Amino acid sequence: MLWIWVPGILGLFGRVEALWPQPSEYSHGNKTLWLSPSVRFTYTNNQRSFIYTRPSYAGINWIPGGWLNLLQNPWGSAEQTVAEPLPNVEQFVEDAIKRTKHAIINSKFVPWKFHPRHQKFEPLVDGQHPTIEEVIINEASKTSQEWSPRNYVNGDEKYEIRISEDGEVQISSRSPIGTIRALQTFQQLFYSHSHSKSYTPFAPISISDSPKWRHRGLNLDISRNVIRPEDVKRTIDAMASVKLNRLHAHAADSQSWPLDIPSIPELAAKASYHPSQVWSSSELEAVQLYGLERGVSVFLEIDLPGHTAAVGHAFPDLVAAYHMDQWEKYAAEPPSGQIKLNSSAVYQFLDLLMADLIPRVSPLTEYFHTGGDEFNLNTYLLEINLGSNDRRVLTPFLDRMITHVHSSLRSSGVTPIVWEELVLDWDLNLPSHKTAGETGGVIVQAWRNSSAVKHVLQKGYQTIFGTGDAWYLDCGVGTFLNPRPGSKAVQNPYLDWCAPTKNWKHMYVYNPLKDIPVELQSLLVGGETHMWSELVDPVNMDQMIWPRAAAAAEVLWTGPRSPDNIQDASYRLAKWRERVVNDAGIRAAMVQMTYCLMRESGCEL
């Protein structure tokens, strides 16, 4: 038996392990175990237990406490409507167990790419290998009443998996989210066999795992190009597989407003790109629930006061410098226009917007992002009741607007997130967790460069990292701007502002702790990669996001990586990529050439 122990940093010992992100501690052998197609999952927490065998009425053997609706629909449903009550967290765990079993049993991932060509690597179907007949899950969690759908993702994510040579499986966790994380790892231990059932070649297995950071996110722009709910759900599936837990949906911008706001029907009706491309209230809730079922909290960003020109399609009187011919004087990108700062009508609009939106999203998330970036001063030269681009004049009006909106968020128990400019450029005195308590402060997201992270931390704010020089996924594809005839503003080679492309290796070795004093590191809540969508739509978004966001996911889960980790990471990340391409329909870009993955000779230099 080969026994390999992996404490944090993996070495290459002949066999490449299957797991992404890398667990905190991982040891394994080289014995094969089959997984029975009728394997039982026995789940126990402090309140109840159930046994799951197969998706049929006869296959669910309930110990007291089960729900009749699951007997009628044992697979559960991702689609929810506003009228339905929210599921409880125990149902999230049950659904995760069902998905895990279904995914393993129905996997199409045969890992031939990871063995020398024509090598017979699959176990013989000779009855000599033990079979896993039961997976026992013990969850030492709080009572279910203490977990709500929106906060359970903040629970203890630590878990352990023990698999013996004889096929005994024990999974232990301390919370529902810990159980879900364990199942996401458990699924990656198995492969499809060309002529038989699923198997793992790694027994015995011992895994102890927990994350480095609690906020592990992807920022997805759903406004500049049409990104539909089904595209976001597909993205959530990939996120969950690498233990990313926050989907930051940049939900509106100057180009379009795709969200239906029932109390302001004109907004999406006039500001969306097309009536068929509006996100209904039920679709938004369904996406949020779909994420929570998989351990991903979906929260919205409505950027204020910049990036709001789309509001002018419905309410032009609320927007200053709306659709100016020389847009570049009034905006970072076209079209120009920002909501007015000194307008009672704007405040009425914001109050109505928040009164509609926040009660709908807050039961399913604890965050709401109010933006605050790329705020153009010249715009307010054209606001009749203001007429100034002087920062000293504008600051009190900006401060008043942000404070007003944030007060409505806090009254609903929602934590505001803002972009870095509000505290670095405008020096607004927003409450931090030190001045307003753990839930009363804002979280600040740094984006322009890595030095901004340190500057935000020095002001005492909890901070999200993932800046343009490290984790921007849209960089390097070229500018969307066309040159005007005779203009030299846009020239060959027509680069975008953050070129070159941040490839997966670059994203993998980004160290968010570099140059951050130890005494400030506790303020780092985590990070996000960013998929801005000027040149992204559902056709190319998968390959633009993946596998690069997965590379960042390991940094967020396991901690900073180094160039010495890249060789091993290329094999593990490529295995993850093959798995989601084959089994989840994710059209992820390549990690490595097949020749290199087969390791017939070195692809190192």
UniProtKB/Swiss-Prot annotation:
GO terms for cellular component: extracellular region; membrane. This is Beta-hexosaminidase ARB_07893. It catalyses: Hydrolysis of terminal non-reducing N-acetyl-D-hexosamine residues in N-acetyl-beta-D-hexosaminides. It is found in: Secreted. Pfam families: Glyco_hydro_20 (PF00728), Glycohydro_20b2 (PF14845). Its EC number is 3.2.1.52. Glycans are attached at residues 30, 342, 449. Its main location: secreted. The active site is at 293 (nucleophile), 374 (proton donor). It comes from Arthroderma benhamiae (strain ATCC MYA-4681 / CBS 112371). The keyword Protease does not apply. Belongs to the glycosyl hydrolase 20 family.
